Amino acid sequence: MREIVHIQGGQCGNQIGAKFWEVISDEHGIDPTGTYHGDSDLQLERINVYYNEATGGRYVPRAILMDLEPGTMDSVRAGPFGQLFRPDNFVFGQTGAGNNWAKGHYTEGAELIDSVLDVVRKEAEGCDCLQGFQITHSLGGGTGSGMGTLLISKVREEYPDRIMETFSVVPSPKVSDTVVEPYNATLSVHQLVENADECMVIDNEALYDICFRTLKLTTPTYGNLNHLVSAAMSGVTCCLRFPGQLNSDLRKLAVNLIPFPRLHFFMIGFAPLTSRGSQQYRALTVPELTQQMFDAKNMMCAADPRHGRYLTASALFRGRMSTKEVDEQMLNVQNKNSSYFVEWIPNNIKSSICDIPPKGLKMAVTFVGNSTAIQEMFKRVAEQFTAMFRRKAFLHWYTGEGMDEMEFTEAESNMNDLVSEYQQYQDATAEEEGEFEEEEGEN
């Protein structure tokens, strides 16, 4: 079957990952000891997308946990599903990366990377037909960003034809955890543009907003934030794990969402988001789901899709619903808001329907959109980067680990190129065909 190898790196990646495994285990009826207690054969039918079956009928996540310090992993191990993971798959150092991308990518991380790759190989060899890798990490710290991107490039070398999907937490505009975030994030994006197939962009501020505004939580914790992310993550691969009328997988997603190879940074959303108390009063309809799914407040990254245009989008529905209704709603959205979709890609929304809804819901939908508005986020990071880099602030921490200023300059210009590519396609119309061809001839 189509297996996925899950890798989580750094504090953020491990916390999101731990939450994700709680959600997935719940969907498949796996308890914290790895035993199956479900009520439907469908839960077991394709459980091997995410789990290996061990002796005595135990199910073990195909997950690799890596970090440069033991702290977060100890808390994962002590957490509710900590005993589920394979002990050999915890790979950690003792030194920490200290929020320094260079430590994660070139020094500390480089020493640990081979032991991580051994575990990755071992998991990949146990697969019948490996679909790809999914990685959860943040771009603001040192391990998830530096070592995460190092791992991505190494895995890319060894498995060039497998899909590499990342769930990357980007530094938020207002909530900053570390001063050097813009450096770490820019250096990471520089890597992700080249080596990843699909990047789902998440940021904490947008998640906080969803918790405050929509879920009416007064004091959201990281646990609440990570729960939102894992709901969307589970939706992306739901079609691989449960039967459906219209299937999708990581590769189909990539083919339908990426019109140009570098533009693979997606916004994700999830609907229905209702506060815990008011859940039982709402029967959701497909039009309501569609409405909420395209709502800017629903996006898990702080970029407003109304400021750009969708190149492509994908709606992954879950639950029993009529295919006809889904198709009608998708057409409806495109016709009514046609100015928000580029006209030179007709029918640019892909939909898929999976029969099994998430726990506690009749219907749900995960939204993945490739919008040119995501450039707002890169612009924001680039401005902060330039402000510091112009004065060479904090640079000695990076050059001290053997990095060169050149690498910063390259990363900066790569990110600026990315922004202008998004802008170019946002402004493009169907009539300008001739001009594009001439431009490409000159390059």
UniProtKB/Swiss-Prot annotation:
GO terms for molecular function: GTP binding; GTPase activity; metal ion binding; structural constituent of cytoskeleton. GTP binds at Q11, E69, S138, G142, T143, G144, N204, N226. The keyword GTP-binding applies. SUPFAM superfamilies: Tubulin C-terminal domain-like (SSF55307), Tubulin nucleotide-binding domain-like (SSF52490). Mg(2+) binds at E69. Keywords: Cytoplasm, Cytoskeleton, GTP-binding, Magnesium, Metal-binding, Microtubule, Nucleotide-binding. Dimer of alpha and beta chains. A typical microtubule is a hollow water-filled tube with an outer diameter of 25 nm and an inner diameter of 15 nM. Alpha-beta heterodimers associate head-to-tail to form protofilaments running lengthwise along the microtubule wall with the beta-tubulin subunit facing the microtubule plus end conferring a structural polarity. Microtubules usually have 13 protofilaments but different protofilament numbers can be found in some organisms and specialized cells. This is Tubulin beta chain.
